[in-house]
Amino acid sequence: MSPHEVIGTVPKNSTTFRTQADEHDDHEEALQNLRTGKYEDWPNEAAFDGLTEERGPIKIAVTGNIPTWAAGSLYRTGPGLYKIDTDAGTTFEMSHWFDGLAHTHRFDIIPNEEGSVDIFYSSRRQAEEMMDVIKKQGTWPYYSFGQKADPCLGFFAKAMAAFKGLREPSGEKWHNNVNVAVHVNPPGLEAVRNIVGTRKPAVAENDANVLGHRPELPKSIWVSTDNSTMKQIDPQTLEPIGWATQDVLHPELTGAMSCAHAQRDPDTGDFFNFNLEFGPKPTYRVFRVDASSGKTEILATIREPSVSPAYIHSLFLSPSFVILCIPTSHFGLSGTQIPWERNLVDAIKPYDPSRKTQWIVIDRKHSKGVVARFETDGRFFFHTVNSFEEKAGSDSSDINLYCDVIDFGSHEFIHSLYLDVILNRDSAAKKFYEDEQRARNSLAHLTRYHFIINPDSPTTNLPVTPTPDPKNHEAFRIPAPHAGEIPTINPLYATRKHRYVYSLPFRGRGTITDAIVKTDTVTREALFWDNPKGHTPGEAIFIPRPGGEEEDDGVLLSLVLDGEKGKSYLLCLDAKTMAEMGRAEVDFAIALGFHGAHVPSGRTLTRVEGPEY
């Protein structure tokens, strides 16, 4: 039997089971794949060129069995446009994957009369104003993640940009490229007084005509990125209808930077994030938006010479604490190098192995502010996984705090995400990965950090906890490909002790993620969905089965590019076995995006007591 034998109309993909004993060999094999150019036989160009929007909704073909309890709307966002023909007859091209112009997608999963589901797809571009400006000017007008600056931009233009700072004029907020994470009904932004620059939502009569039983829509959908701007989109039409900066939540949140992955308390719905203000005294303000009142409280203000402004993509939330982890990706000139370089990547200081990762633990229950600080070996990360707490012992008031994160040896990984490397233009991937240390630093690890918190600690002037051997803070570190990027867990286990992490590993077979893996953090076993060659998966979003009592009782939804055919499909995997249950195939390629959110229809997720691990 071939590993992809077709049973009925559903490809039966095999799974691969690996143990902790295989970690080293599998890691070295991934490095060998990079050295030998294994990725050259893994097509993914279709996800980066010739992409269009489909305002639809259109019905797409379903094969196999996607359970009816997965009904709802799956929203996904990410970059989707990389080339723009200008009025001058030239073509402007994005340099970095993260700078592709925003494109949001929706899959509506609707139970039908036959006991299965129908699936409808629609999508819409989110940065048409910026596209128009680029078309007219022939260049990128504002700050970016990694877009290479126009070489014709002179000293005076750079100096003026630095003088103006990072915040666009309010009339130009619509030009902001917001394309990373999806937030459903975030508190504090529902009131009209807090929404700046709103437009009137469009009316989508076609939705009702095509869908019949329209799925339940959320009150609001917002999209975020790594600055302090969020963009609102119509949950039905996907049209951009509003934007807001964090200062509408609190007047002190005036900094230009934040993180794309704010945290939500799974019980109260409270919203947590930070705001980063640059200048002579860079300042982090960690805040909470109360879900019941919509009011914002600043939990901690951190303005110290020893705490550098850094690129931070996500933060941690545990039952008692917000944990701000500051990796090695420090910005130069106290952050003011960003307007000089006009992008984040070039404004980050070169990697320095002597630079430590800083951990700042902030009380979120009793207004104590900063309650602990730690340092660990200098590493870089994009995505936190989860954070949970345990008592240190029956006779101790200390708290064991655990933080799971996908981290890297350095922030050089960011440079592997330039489109030249992803698409291996002029052998750029070969040139990047021929440096073995750089290749090693580009492979992810799932790391669990363990800290001991004394809840009776003073709230100010806390010393950094001495750490003669920073590795003492590591409970474990699981290397790629037994873990990978874009991690997810069962959402019912957020801020609780979890066992399973689902992620997209990098095995060196492609130039970006090339598999889906389920990692058991107790046994360190890894179970892979064995995708066919050239099938590049996106974020695996976990949908719990109603009434399920086991942590892995549910399904995973992942948008996959079939690079061989130049088409995409929505994949449904059994989260326990990693076997394919069904798929919904689209007759064209959909961009490789970043993150999404599933809005269930007809039910509310309920947290249950899970097993003890």
Swiss-Prot record:
GO terms classed as biological process: carotene catabolic process; carotenoid biosynthetic process
Entry keyword set: Carotenoid biosynthesis, Cytoplasm, Dioxygenase, Iron, Metal-binding, Oxidoreductase
Identification of the protein by name: Carotenoid dioxygenase
Positions of region (Disordered): 1-25
Upregulation: The expression is subject to photoinduction in a wc-1 and wc-2 dependent manner.
Cofactor(s) needed: Fe(2+)
GO molecular function: carotenoid dioxygenase activity; metal ion binding
Keyword tRNA processing appears in the UniProt entry: no
InterPro entries named in the record: Carotenoid_Oase (IPR004294)
Catalysis: reaction(s): torulene + O2 = 4'-apo-beta-carotenal + 3-methyl-2-butenal
Disulphides: none
Organism domain of life: Eukaryota
The keyword DNA damage appears for this protein: no
Similarity section: Belongs to the carotenoid oxygenase family.
Source organism: Neurospora crassa (strain ATCC 24698 / 74-OR23-1A / CBS 708.71 / DSM 1257 / FGSC 987)
GO cellular component: cytosol
